[in-house]
């Protein structure tokens, strides 16, 4: 059985890690052992923050909706309750976009919600 030398595979593995560490500062971008740790940690942060991003954006949408609804003398929780009563099925992302970019349409929705809450 022939002897297996691992020079080619080791070089490929090292090259992959070094390429992933491009743009890092100091020895993190050209020393394999340090770059490997940096890339592993970057992957952990990326994994965690892909999940965290969803929470952050939802909070942003809620904040924007709340600010826009308060201009119409209503609170966020009353507004969301009114949306359910008026059976308006718009998600928070769309509502936040409307509150920022299409104030007239958002005002019309608030008017419908106020009618549903009053009824």
UniProtKB/Swiss-Prot annotation:
MF terms (GO), sorted A to Z: rRNA binding; structural constituent of ribosome
Pfam families, per the entry: Ribosomal_L20
Keyword Magnesium listed: no
CC terms in the record's Gene Ontology section: ribonucleoprotein complex; ribosome
One of the protein's GO biological processes: translation
InterPro entries (UniProt xref): Ribosomal_bL20, RIBOSOMAL_L20_CS, Ribosomal_protein_bL20_C
SUPFAM superfamilies: Ribosomal protein L20
Swiss-Prot/TrEMBL keywords: Ribonucleoprotein, Ribosomal protein, RNA-binding, rRNA-binding
KW Plastid (keyword) present: no
Protein family per UniProt: Belongs to the bacterial ribosomal protein bL20 family.
Reported function: Binds directly to 23S ribosomal RNA and is necessary for the in vitro assembly process of the 50S ribosomal subunit. It is not involved in the protein synthesizing functions of that subunit.
NCBIfam families cross-referenced by the UniProt entry: rplT_bact (TIGR01032)
Protein name: Large ribosomal subunit protein bL20
Annotated gene: rplT
